[in-house]
Amino acid sequence: EYAGINGIRQDTHPYADFDMMSEWCKAVTDEYPDFNIVGETWLNSNVLVSFWQKDSRLAAPRNSNLRTVMDFPLMEQMNKAFDEETTDWNGGLYRLYDYLTQDLVYADPMNLLVFLDNHDTSRFYLNEEATQNIDRYKQALVFLLTTRGIPQIYYGTEILMAADKANGDGRLRCDFPGGWKYDPRNCFYEANRTPQQNEAFTYMQKLLQWRKGNEVIAKGRLKHFAPNKGIYVYARKYGN
């Protein structure tokens, strides 16, 4: 009402009392219907995550009233899928197809937060050497920004920042280079980024500009087909 924010992320949502959080979510969204609450639901299967979404059949007759939950299982599948160049039905792009065929467990798959990484997980690239495979970045980014759900992009992804959780959470949350007087390099400026970082930055920028205002991609139903010879085809349709 005063801050003008569109929503908040509720940390470790399932840790709190179910009924209290249900009442709170309902009270907030009844008063501010355009305000969204994203619940951190860090669970390892879509069945478990789906329990916490508003109107879940699995939770009935109880109702969390939490509109948006975080799709951690899809994050895991994406990080594996784009590393596996295979046509097998148990790996590669088939992981994405197989996972999305199970969306019926969710009350509203369109209100899932989808992401490649975040401040609690290893970054999409574990180290600088891995960033040399920029095709992995491009394929994953296209999927993230065209599949169902609400995409979230962790800062630094646009310049291929890399970090392994095994080296501590501090590595995952390193400052973005630049923005402060004494930073040795300012990656807010094209001239200070490497050619590869500029390639990644421009690629994301173009994708986001294309997606902005695109109701088909943002709201359309997803139709997909089983991967064939390493090719995964899907489409989005909105209205007629």
Question: Model features per residue range: what roles?
Answer:
Residues L112, Y155-T157, K219-K223:
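Short coil/turn segments at secondary-structure boundaries
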Residues D108-Q132:
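Active-site clefts of carbohydrate-active enzymes
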Residues N6-A107, L112, N133, F143, ...:
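Active-site-proximal helices and loops of the catalytic beta/alpha 8
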Residues Y137-Q139:
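Conserved interdomain hinge at the start of the Helicase C-terminal
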Residues I217-G239:
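Surface beta-strand/loop "capping" patches
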